[in-house]
């Protein structure tokens, strides 16, 4: 597709976690075209950033990846299964999905919230959690750096702590794919940096895990992010390795204003306008 950055490692026969071919989505009520001609492949161990202005189609695209909706045209394969030819309930159980809008009972402890990831429920199903499952929930809290929150009510945890608890919850099913929908939303600087570090360590410890992170801010990308896809008005503007995609010209086109990008020690930043 014109405007896309080719990935030299792409091979149609490679193993894929996600494979989208000529995907389009129209809004049923208005026939508005939301996504158009999306081609995209994500492989094990790749960590993608999904960026675009408000209304570019990021939320709709993430819903497709999470098997929460079907495309109007084209094909979507998630974890080797084509949407429309698979029981999406079983498929969703193999996908980790984290969003700040998740419904979580505020009085549950952090450990109980993580346990609900095993049963895929909002409320705990205590009889289904044996000692091994409970121990795994503790291990995931430790892996995300929040083991001290195990007995703390979720409702009194900070925004950054909640984000890490929800990621631990998503990992209970040992997914091959982790979708993160603006996980840094409303976090202060220390909480953002704690989550960036936690995600970087998570990626290092799980070499086969693939992630897709929706964000508006390059500063939120953890160093292990290897690829990026830019959406503009429902179409892919560019995709591929971060070095070739997160550039001044492409981000300027993506967001419609002059943007300057910098990278230091594996971390990205961007600003718009003149330096003062």
Regions from the PLM with identified roles:
Residues 174:
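Conserved catalytic motifs of ABC-family nucleotide-binding domains
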Residues 178-182:
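Catalytic Walker B motif of ABC-type/P-loop ATPase nucleotide-binding domains
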Residues 74-84:
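Conserved ABC transporter NBD signature motif
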Residues 66:
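Helix-to-loop junction immediately C-terminal to a conserved catalytic motif
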């Amino acid at each position: 597709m014109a405007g896309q950055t080719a990935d030299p490692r792409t091979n149609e026969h490679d193993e894929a976690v996600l494979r989208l071919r000529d995907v389009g989505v129209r809004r049923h009520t208005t026939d508005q075209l939301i996504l158009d001609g999306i081609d995209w492949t994500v492989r094990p161990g790749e960590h993608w950033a999904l960026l675009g202005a408000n209304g570019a189609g990021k939320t709709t695209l993430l819903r497709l990846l999470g098997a929460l909706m079907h495309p109007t045209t084209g094909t979507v394969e998630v974890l080797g299964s084509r949407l429309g030819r698979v029981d999406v309930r079983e498929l969703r159980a193999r996908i980790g999905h984290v969003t700040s809008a998740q419904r979580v009972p505020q009085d549950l402890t952090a450990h109980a919230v993580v346990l609900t990831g095993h049963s895929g429920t909002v409320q705990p199903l205590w009889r289904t959690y044996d000692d091994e499952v409970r121990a795994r929930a503790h291990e995931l809290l430790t892996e995300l750096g929040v083991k001290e929150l195990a007995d703390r009510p979720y409702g009194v945890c900070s925004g950054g702590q909640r984000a890490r608890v929800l990621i631990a919850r998503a990992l209970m099913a040992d997914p091959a794919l982790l979708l993160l929908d603006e996980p840094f939303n409303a976090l202060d600087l220390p909480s953002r940096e704690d989550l960036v570090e936690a995600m970087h360590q998570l990626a290092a410890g799980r070499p086969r895990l693939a992630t897709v992170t929706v964000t508006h801010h390059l500063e939120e990308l953890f160093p292990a992010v290897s690829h990026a896809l830019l959406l503009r008005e429902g179409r892919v503007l560019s995709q591929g390795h971060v070095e070739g995609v997160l550039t001044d010209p492409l981000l300027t086109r993506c967001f419609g204003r002059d943007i300057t990008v910098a990278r230091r020690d594996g971390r990205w930043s961007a600003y718009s306008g003149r330096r003062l």
